[in-house]
Amino acid sequence: MAQHLLHGTLHATIYEVDDLHTGGLRSGFFGKILANVEETIGVGKGETQLYATIDLQRARVGRTRKIKDEAKNPKWYESFHIYCAHLASDIIFTVKDDNPIGATLIGRAYVPVDQVIHGEEVDQWVEILDNDRNPIHGGSKIHVKLQYFGVEADRNWNQGIKSAKFPGVPYTFFSQRQGCKVSLYQDAHIPDNFVPRIPLAGGKNYEPQRCWEDIFDAISNAQHMIYITGWSVYTEIALVRDSRRPKPGGDVTVGELLKKKASEGVRVLLLVWDDRTSVDVLKKDGLMATHDEETENFFRGSDVHCILCPRNPDDGGSIVQNLQVSAMFTHHQKIVVVDSEMPSRGGSQMRRIVSFVGGIDLCDGRYDTPFHSLFRTLDTVHHDDFHQPNFTGAAITKGGPREPWHDIHSRLEGPIAWDVLYNFEQRWSKQGGKDILVKLRELSDIIITPSPVMFQEDHDVWNVQLFRSIDGGAAAGFPESPEAAAEAGLVSGKDNIIDRSIQDAYIHAIRRAKDFIYIENQYFLGSSFAWAADGITPEDINALHLIPKELSLKIVSKIEKGEKFRVYVVVPMWPEGLPESASVQAILDWQRRTMQMMYKDIVQALRAQGLEEDPRNYLTFFCLGNREVKKEGEYEPAERPDADSSYMKAQEARRFMIYVHTKMMIVDDEYIIIGSANINQRSMDGARDSEIAMGGYQPHHLSHRQPARGQIHGFRMSLWYEHLGMLDETFLDPSSVECIEKVNRISDKYWDLYSSESLEHDLPGHLLRYPVDVDGEGDVTEFPGFEFFPDTKARILGTKSDYLPPILTT
């Protein structure tokens, strides 16, 4: 049967199955006794636990709760709001009986896509078939209702944010908040006079903010509460390191600062991920050095309450699924929540809530500036914070290159800050143990309730919404019934409730986009349902999030309409760790497959329009790197790396990648998403890694009638200045072919300088072409002369792993 593209939203309801015959083993008096015995002694199957799933061809897009002991006529009455970007011939409903390990297939029902593609509502009983497409015993049917709405029917499709009344992303746990203030941070610190003049609307110029200095001030000035979550929190780092910008008490470590505040009576609560994984392959690759045990030991016996919290599964998974969650997934949110003084209220004792959200953990290896030096800070700010997990045996005593760290964070003020606080309270209530959260109601005469910090008329005001990837295993207070979950903007699964709103936010922003999208992310892989087979079975990969496919379909739609649209993506050269290792190579392989899927969509669309254009003029990938000549007076290590090692080669060539740890997307210079979530399945799933992100815009700086020139525009231009080492008039319009061609040319030049044998000057900028090629069919191929990353034996295109499970590396 012919496949159709379902690109839009599918509303589906699964009602019930009639007259189901599951073999009769659980029916009758003796069947009940058998089930009870099995349940009591913990063997066998116990009672029936029937559930239904929804698939679009090879992609699982919906799952009901389990109905216990209703073997003949299970009734679910569950509705689903499904974002789709899938080629499919059928919408498939599968009925299964859950087991402690795996599930027993009852049968499948098929609704042809051509019945729904034009938007008609389909409400019918559909015959359930076996694997050979024959009716199952008893002729059972499933009652379903379906209605499909294509993206063209969405009033926001291709429209951007049309007015200040834009309500935010629908069907989410947290609503959009008005009257907020947002500070945007590039890297942990920016030295004085780094950014040149970047004009904004109203005659203003962009002013960069300093993340770790602001976090230091926020913690230092807190009087009632300091709440922190992190993938890692390392007590030995200092937040203030710029000798030209000293602060009173700034030489103290994070650990000592938190102890000091707790001893003063401030409630200091930390939720740090408990790395209890036994997956040795990751540990030996250097991916999990979180210091969690050291942090717990440091605070033991102090007034700081530090909880190491594992990534516990929700209650609904099978034994295998629960083991996967607890052993393979992490708590990845990076937030700080404090009480803060009121701005401009001379002498007021009232306090408010301020929150920080983004990609930067308070741990080693994160402090950096936009200069991203490899060697020149090894005797100063990075001497005691040398981070280089990509070489075996790397150490400050053997010298650079260190691994520079590029990241993005945000500070949130106003009602949105309280949503971040509520997220912490939900997590602490679930995994924090003692109920020692500050009772804010008892401080209502001191801490003001959620209220705007800026008037809507103020031209600097923000509207902001909080998004998460999290489930009931990590957050308390989620509703239990599917109906209540749907009303709360949550997704119900097989007896687990999931907040998947980060993925929803990305999908909505991409669909709204008019002109261009700029992405920086630590990972870029997904939409595996659309990958070519090419040595894999795509349905076994389960990296099902839609973001890459949404991006390529957006570009295709613009090509078909003859409208300009560009997507710029910045990723690291490789995921942090030994680049030759199986896990890193597997991720690079998934990344190649993702890129190739997107480029094939673009090439086919260009060909259909009779265009012979370079697909990199529509979608282009970059990485960051630095290269420095040796200067007099530089740090001289006492030892040397092993001869002929990658470490030694990189040291002699004076080059290394700048690690892109960012999780950010900018759309049309008017909307920005910043958080902890990577563009992979772990982060976007909702039931894997726990994540948090903000999405916001300035209602007075939209791109509706003229280019947006608010803080988001200034932030992007500042980032481009950091990466390119220059500003140019063409950068003002990233949607123009002149802009993308210029950025591609510069990055090609910088790659040539980075990878050349000789070095006469410092690299003039950091933005490098991602070293792959795209052929006339859209296949991602080896960049001529570069099978391996410079100084390594690591394949740039990656290598499929024959033994690492995809769930670990996607």
From Swiss-Prot:
Membrane-spanning intervals of the chain: none
GO biological process, one term: phosphatidylcholine metabolic process
Gene Ontology molecular-function annotations: calcium ion binding; phospholipase D activity
Propeptide, chain numbering: 1-36
Reactions that this protein is recorded to catalyse: a 1,2-diacyl-sn-glycero-3-phosphocholine + H2O = a 1,2-diacyl-sn-glycero-3-phosphate + choline + H(+)
Pfam families for this protein: C2 (PF00168), PLD_C (PF12357), PLDc (PF00614)
Cofactor note text: Ca(2+) requirement for activity depends on pH. Active either under acidic conditions with micromolar levels of calcium (PIP2-dependent) or at neutral pH with millimolar levels of calcium (PIP2-independent).
Residue stretches making up the PLD phosphodiesterase domain: 327-366, 656-683
Keywords, alphabetical: Calcium, Cytoplasm, Hydrolase, Lipid degradation, Lipid metabolism, Membrane, Metal-binding, Repeat
Cofactor(s) recorded in Swiss-Prot or TrEMBL: Ca(2+)
Amino acids binding Ca(2+): 187, 372, 406, 722
EC number from the UniProt entry: 3.1.4.4
UniProt membrane topology term: Peripheral membrane protein
Compartments (UniProt record): Cytoplasm; Membrane
Residues annotated as binding a 1,2-diacyl-sn-glycero-3-phosphate: 332, 522, 661
Ranges of residues in domain C2: 1-126
Residues at the catalytic site: 332, 334, 339, 661, 663, 668
Gene Ontology CC, one term: cytoplasm
Superkingdom classification of source: Eukaryota
Other information: The propeptide appears to play a key role in the proper folding and activation of the enzyme.
Function as written in the Swiss-Prot or TrEMBL entry: Hydrolyzes glycerol-phospholipids at the terminal phosphodiesteric bond. Plays an important role in various cellular processes, including phytohormone action, vesicular trafficking, secretion, cytoskeletal arrangement, meiosis, tumor promotion, pathogenesis, membrane deterioration and senescence.
Free-text note regarding domains: C2 domain is a calcium-binding fold, and the binding promotes the protein association with membranes. A lower affinity toward calcium can be anticipated for PLD alpha due to the absence of two potential calcium ligands.
Family in the record: Belongs to the phospholipase D family. C2-PLD subfamily.
UniProt name for this protein: Phospholipase D alpha 1
Organism (species): Brassica oleracea var. capitata
Lineage: Eukaryota, Viridiplantae, Streptophyta, Embryophyta, Tracheophyta
